[in-house]
Amino acid sequence: MLRSTLVALDGSAYSESAATLAIDWAYRFKARLLALGVLDAPTIQRAEPVPLGASAYKQARDEARMTDARHRVQSFLADFRGRSQSAGVPAEVIEDIGDPAASIVNEAHRCDVVVLARETHFHFETQDRPDETLAQVLRSSPRPVVVVPRELPEGRGVVVAYGGGREASRTLQTFHLLGIAAGETIEVLSIHRDRAQAEALSHQAAEYLAAHGAPHRQHAIVSAAPPAEVILERVRHARPRLLVIGAHGYHPLRDLFATSVTRAVLRACPVPAFVGA
């Protein structure tokens, strides 16, 4: 069962949705909740070429940025603490200094899942564009990562995109044993050009769920279209509250973010996505 959740916050609108989901799950499953804010010192203080005699200016600028970043991290962590208390959920708030992805991965060892926004802005003090924290965490996290879109739509049930293989099987097992389905129906979605292969894949996952008494249904799709397109279309039609996705085909899980299937799904998925570790 889900006993502890880590949510990593950066103060962005995407981060707000991640916080909402983390608080909801902590309340629903009576799980311990940890909220992490990271002061991105390595990026703020990184070496860079400066004109002769300008080193003092850079030092002063870096110190000002560090002070501002610290205040911002403390502010959104305080806001989160207030939100969680209002929801009746006790939360442990952690302020760290260092590389954001490394800090998240380190704290993940203490928890069952990591909740992270689909678009991350941990380098907020030095850049206005999204950073690569999510990709780095997906490659290195010892725990499943729940990738949250900017908006949290209403939904019910779970869709499991099951492609077979060791990593996909482990993802399904971890998801089920954490109890996150909470008794809702799990739709096992399998995709293949050959009908027999598609049905065989969905049957594998369905047998596992049946052995555990989990409500489920099989949905084998015969299609030559790109798998990401099929998955996203099904999610939009079914409107689940969660998508569970493991490795597809021959791609190892550590390289999931680099594969076209998972990258495309995570980029456009309208619901939170549970990605196995």
Question: Which residues fall in each region the model found?
Answer:
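Gly/Ser-rich helix-loop-strand patches that form or flank binding pockets
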Residues: 19-21, 26, 93, 101-152, ...
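A short acidic, glycine-rich active-site loop
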Residues: 56-72
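Small/aliphatic-rich secondary-structure junction motif
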Residues: 1-60, 140, 153-221, 240
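Short, small-residue-enriched loops and turns at beta-alpha junctions
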Residues: 122-124, 193-198, 224-225, 251-252
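Structural beta-alpha unit
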Residues: 1, 40-43, 67, 71-114, ...
